Structures are given as structure tokens and as C-alpha cells.
């Protein structure tokens, strides 16, 4: 229930992402480079719901992006386990952070992914995860464990998109896929990319919409289909402050427009108690 697209524009390589899911909430993490196993990791930004070790998406300091969506297993059953000889075994979501900490390009990311035996943690829900990987040079990969990786370049064609079908499947009946494909030419920058995400939102299920510029390392974020309020961040500026995390509840309350709404509301005294008339 997700949509991820990538498009080359004059302002940079843009990735747009709707996280459509059953569970609300989320947390942003800014992770500076650290020494790990004797080597420095790449600094990165991630968004997650299940813990800092299991992000749904992220981008590192070099402009490498990895995001995931699910596919039904009846459309693309997992292959027989041929990864038993791989030394690294990892959760699919955990692999996103692991790879972002180490890779610079799409090709490097795929090479690292190929060394990992990925645990299909969503099989109990009849789902598999597939990934869109993109770098700041416009190199794209569609990756799903056990399947052949598809490489593309944003230099050729209007853009690339994944939803909830394998890239090799006939997806003519997916409204979100078709809508994005038909409106790629409208994506000129961050604002128009966000408008395209708004077109393919799913009212009860879109938890966040994010646009990443893989060259300037900017991110724009809207929460729970509230496209009137856009949270804008410079990943580089935030990383300079050191490690930080910010949950969606705190993020929404910190927005100046939200603060102004509280300041504009009146309060009435009733039954010897202060009762806020917020209309929320």
C-alpha cells in the first residue's frame, strides 16, 4: 500500500514516497557518522515506526536512498531458500539502515544486499518487501530478495515508480502506478513532487508523504494527508547538530501554524474547571 517514484529534474534527483499502512505514527532519525567495526559509517536520515534499527526508508550523506513497499506473495511467491550459505542474516527493514551506513551508489547498495540473507518478516501477512534504490547520479535499482535485480537510469525515460506489484508484473490496473506514470512531466521540483503524492494518497492509510532531493539533501514531509502543513528539513544542517530523533506528535506540535492555532483559541470557564474550546 505504498508509492515510491524517482525523477530527474533541473533541481536534482527527486524521490517521492507515500507510506500507506495500517499503523499511524512515525519517528525521524538523524544519525551522524560513527566508528563501527573499525570503519566510519555514512551519516544518514531515516523514518521508521518499529525502531531505529528497522526504518521504512532513508537517505545517507552521499545522496543514496532506499525505500520499501510490499507485494502480495500470490503475485510473486518467494523463491526456495538459496541463501543458507550467506554469512549475514538480517531483517528486511534492518537491511535498509545497514546498507545506507556503508554504500555510496546504487550499484554498491545492491552488491551489499546480495551478501545478505534477508528474513521475509511479512510472510505471515502474505506480503513480501521490494525496494527502490536510487543515488544522486540518477541510477535506480528495483530489488527483491531472490529475484533478478532491475537496473535503470533516470537519464532515460520520464521517471520510475513502484507500488505494490512486482516490477515484472502486469500492473495496468493500479491507479497509483498509472497516475504517477502519466504525470511525471509535471514534477519540476519539491512542491510539484509533493502534489503528485497528494494525487495518489489513500485517505485512511497514507501515514506520511515525503520528498527527498538526493543532491541538495533536503526533505519535505507531510503527515497523515495534511498537505496544508509541510515540514521542511536540510539533512546536512540537522546532522551537524549531532544525533537527534523527532516523533510525529512532537513534530506536529512544534509547527508554527499549529502553535498559532492554539494561541488563537479561546478558553471558557465551566463548572470550576478550565475547559479548552479547541474544536479538535
Model-derived regions, located:
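C-terminal, well-structured catalytic/ligand-binding subdomain of enzymes
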Residues: 1-101, 126-280
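Short N-terminal edge-element motif at the start of the domain
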Residues: 100-102, 108-118
Amino acid at each position: 500500500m505504498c508509492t515510491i517514484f524517482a525523477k530527474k529534474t533541473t533541481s536534482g534527483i527527486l524521490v517521492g514516497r507515500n507510506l500507506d499502512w495500517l499503523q499511524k505514527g512515525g519517528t525521524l532519525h538523524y544519525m551522524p557518522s560513527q566508528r563501527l567495526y573499525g570503519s566510519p559509517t555514512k551519516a544518514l536520515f531515516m523514518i521508521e515506526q518499529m525502531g531505529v534499527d528497522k526504518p521504512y526508508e532513508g537517505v545517507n550523506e552521499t545522496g543514496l536512498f532506499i525505500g520499501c513497499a510490499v507485494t502480495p506473495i500470490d503475485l510473486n511467491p518467494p523463491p526456495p531458500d538459496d541463501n543458507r550459505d550467506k554469512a549475514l542474516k538480517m531483517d528486511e527493514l534492518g537491511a535498509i539502515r545497514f546498507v545506507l551506513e556503508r554504500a555510496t551508489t546504487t550499484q554498491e547498495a545492491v552488491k551489499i544486499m546480495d551478501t545478505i540473507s534477508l528474513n521475509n518478516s511479512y510472510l505471515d501477512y502474505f506480503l513480501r518487501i521490494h525496494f527502490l534504490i536510487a543515488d544522486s547520479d540518477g541510477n535506480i535499482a528495483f530489488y527483491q530478495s531472490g529475484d533478478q535485480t532491475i537496473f535503470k537510469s533516470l537519464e532515460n525515460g520520464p521517471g520510475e515508480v513502484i507500488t505494490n506489484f512486482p516490477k515484472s508484473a502486469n500492473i495496468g490496473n493500479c491507479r497509483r502506478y498509472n497516475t504517477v506514470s502519466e504525470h511525471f512531466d509535471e514534477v519540476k521540483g519539491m512542491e510539484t513532487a509533493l502534489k503528485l503524492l497528494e494525487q495518489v494518497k489513500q485517505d485512511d492509510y497514507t501515514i506520511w508523504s515525503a520528498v527527498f532531493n538526493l543532491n541538495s539533501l533536503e526533505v519535505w514531509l507531510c503527515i497523515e494527508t495534511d498537505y496544508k502543513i509541510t515540514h521542511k528539513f536540510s539533512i546536512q544542517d540537522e546532522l551537524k547538530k549531532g544525533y537527534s530523533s523527532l516523533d510525529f506528535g512532537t513534530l506536529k506540535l512544534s509547527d508554527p501554524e499549529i502553535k498559532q492555532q492554539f494561541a488563537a483559541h479561546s478558553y471558557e470557564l465551566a463548572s470550576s474547571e478550565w475547559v479548552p474550546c479547541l474544536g479538535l
